[in-house]
Amino acid sequence: MNLRHLLATSAATALLSPIAHAAGDMPPAQPPQPAEGADLPTISVTDTRHLPESFDQRYATTQVLTRADLDRLSPSDPSITQALATLPGVTVSQNGGPGSSASVSIRGSSASQVAVFIDGIRIGSPTTGIAPWADLPTEAFERVEVISGPAAASFGANAMGGVVQLFTRRAAGQPNQTTVSFGGGSNKTFDTQLRTSGTVPSTGPLAALGGLTYTLGLHDYNTAGIDATRPVLPYHEDGRNPYHAQDLDARLGYARDNWSISTFALYHRSDLSYDNAGFANRELDHQLTTGLAFHLDVTPDTQFDQSFGYANDRQFLYASDPAIPTDQINSQRISSSTSLTHQAHGFHLFGLPLSGETKVAYDFTREQAFLPVDVPDGVPTRNDSAFSLHQSATLGSVTMFVAGRHEIIAGKAVNTGNAALSWAITPVYTARVSYGNAFRLPSFNDLYYPGYGNPDLSPERSDSVEAALDANTAYGTFSAAIYDTRVSNLIAYNPATFSPINIGRAHIRGIDLSYKGTIGRYTPVSVAIGILNPQDETNDSWLNRRPRQTVSVNVDHTWDEFHLHALSTGASLSYGGTTFDDPANTTYLPSYLSVNLRASYRINAHLTVSATLSNLFDRQYMTAYGYNTLGRTAFGKVSYTF
């Protein structure tokens, strides 16, 4: 069987139970005030993994995609990847059309060097070490938060290039609201959604549950797809590769004066056809992530948080030839997290106001994987226990943040740390310098796969420094960051032993630039630019599939000046620079430019219609050699809310 597909991970079956397990391939003193009249977006990085609640641009480069952003930027994409690609320093490569394996890189990292969480619960396959990006449904999430740079002291393993936090949809205390939508478009694509959310009233037959918030979403996406591969690949097969995905997300929450409890579940099922002539060429995935969280305000300045998580991935690999047996890969992760946070304020030093926050935390994770082959030492299992301490302090216009983490993984100790210092130079400009180290754990495939794995592998390690300048002006927000990362112990394949070993070194330097603001009154604009120098020092080459320049421009306009306030139109431009597909830099991937158009019209308070035209000029390009991307496609949708 083709190793490329056998090593792919899988996805999970189970459903939400507040008392069940709770929890997840390829591929501050006051902050500076804005200038008068400035209309600025709010950045609120949520405290789900023991970061201070004030964690923001003063500690690390942070980008947030709101629900409105997701609706605009990926209206026809079933996965979250298209929206992520609009952020500075984020690049996406994919092996074909919808549903095919995808890889997300932050600041030149590999896909396995990005930590991903859903409502604070880690996701990603223990077998491959990569999140199932193509199977993360855009419609399930309220917002997305991306932290660029190392954050292992707060998030643990794999947070080398950055962290992606996905937060599921939730009710905001409003009465019941239900939305039904139907969409369709090119490649025989059909999209059906139902979403309801609200708060149980404190009167009536359910008064005993008064104040309980709930949300439930159902999503069905079906497409005939495209021919994912080109004839240059040896396993190419003619014909389209259809994809069918079904998603369910649910959440319950209840809050009193000083405590709250919530539980969520996200279930995904998909059926994908892919090219792999003579071997397994159909993949059935089941994925479940579920969690339970409790919060208590011990005092007005002290908070206690406890959460439990469970993630299960199950994947079935089928072949067209019935003589070829079906393979099954099953992995699971159980986790718990406990933290205590205290804020101190009202102090003065040298005549300046002094405040701070201290957080201590303990995390535990247990990972297991059941492979379709015999492993000599039995079922691969890994336990991870971690203690961490976080401290922030603000004196006048200067803020300091330090974090340290001591982790015991499979009996071996790993220590990581982060430090940042920011200075509010003026009410408009804030400067920041930071340092962090991080690590990436070997995947179970790296360690144990028969005929390939090496159980003596050590974690990959990195050290990063960053300098940044942020400006909050009347014209919008500007951010510039320059970073330098050195990676050691990179896991690379050794042809002499037919197994991976720790021999690689990399030096990654880059600049991230971003702008977000409004031109006039009705035209929001966002621009993201990434400049990357990703050097593989071991092979004296470029790290593969890392474009050296990326640009994303998004412009929208509401036509209020013509009294058409219900009409909104927009355009997106995406550019990816040249790169190579292979580590030896022998397979060239040219640059590409893609333009998308969109329009939305609110007919009345209940009914909205929208349309998108993607890849307007029908550019034929590749983000992975031999794999096609979508050509020009059209998609329309009707939504009704009641």
Give residue ranges: language-model regions.
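Conserved C-terminal beta-signal and adjacent last beta-strands/turns
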Residues: 9, 40, 197-210, 433, ...
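Gram-negative outer-membrane beta-barrel transporters
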Residues: 26, 356, 393-399, 484-486, ...
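N-terminal periplasmic "start-of-domain" segments of outer-membrane beta-barrel proteins
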Residues: 41-73, 103, 111
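Extracytoplasmic beta-strand/coil segments of soluble accessory domains associated
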Residues: 81-125, 142
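Short acidic/polar hinge/loop motifs at secondary-structure boundaries
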Residues: 121-148
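Periplasmic-side early beta-strands and strand-to-turn transitions of outer-membrane beta-barrels
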Residues: 165, 174-175, 181-183, 195-286
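Outer-membrane beta-barrel signature, preferentially recognizing the C-terminal barrel domain
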Residues: 280-289, 297, 330-332, 430, ...
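Structural signature of Gram-negative outer-membrane beta-barrels, strongest in the C-terminal barrel
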Residues: 350-359, 363-487, 556, 604
